[in-house]
UniProtKB/Swiss-Prot annotation:
Chief localization: cytoplasm
GO biological process, one term: ribosomal small subunit assembly
Organism: Synechococcus elongatus (strain ATCC 33912 / PCC 7942 / FACHB-805) (Anacystis nidulans R2)
Described function: Required for maturation of 30S ribosomal subunits.
Keywords on record: Cytoplasm, Ribosome biogenesis
Subcellular location: Cytoplasm
One GO cellular component term: cytosol
Family: Belongs to the RimP family.
Matching Pfam families: RimP_N (PF02576)
The name this protein goes by in its record: Ribosome maturation factor RimP
Signal sequence extent: none
NCBIfam families per record: PRK00092.3-3 (NF000935)
Chain coiled-coil ranges: none
């Protein structure tokens, strides 16, 4: 369950990211840490996301966040970009990571959890497609629980 401050944080972060040609992928507020950690994952709209993008977003967002006083106590702000071990969700994710090794977790017809690894071939309205040892494997999207990047097969 998302922290109750996340909607206000996203409302503040998205226009700043837009001005920098960036997109906010997600925000997570880890309040079980001392001090709490606010992590924003960003992605460049015009190419690869680099350290410079994270630095620009960090500087701009930190000022706005402090002015808005959404988080009254001390916190740590982390700006990062999606990478390995991240879950693929959007159409852009599936296009960007086509050809990369992934692990697909799905639900079988008898309600078991099944994990398959392969090279991502793509996704359409009905299925996710993997290459497993030279064979194309089709997994119905209705059965897919999660698609994650992995380091290698």
């Amino acid at each position: 369950m998302a922290h109750p401050l996340i909607p206000a944080i996203l409302d503040l972060a998205r226009p700043i990211a837009d001005d920098l040609d960036l997109e906010v992928v997600q925000a997570v507020f880890h309040t079980n840490q001392s001090p709490p950690i606010l992590r924003l994952d960003i992605r460049s709209r015009v190419g690869d996301t680099g350290l410079e993008d994270c630095e620009r977003m960090s500087r701009s967002f930190e000022l706005a966040l402090d002015e808005a006083n959404i988080i009254p106590d001390a916190y740590v702000l982390e700006i990062s970009s999606p990478g390995l071990s991240d879950t693929l969700e959007s159409d852009r994710d599936f296009l960007s990571f086509k050809g990369f090794p992934v692990q697909v977790t799905s639900r079988s017809p008898n309600d078991d959890t099944v994990e398959q690894q392969g090279t991502l071939l793509g996704r359409d309205a009905d299925s996710v497609y993997l290459n497993k040892r030279g064979r194309t494997v089709r997994i119905a999207r209705s059965q897919v629980l999660e698609v994650k990047l992995i380091e290698q097969l």
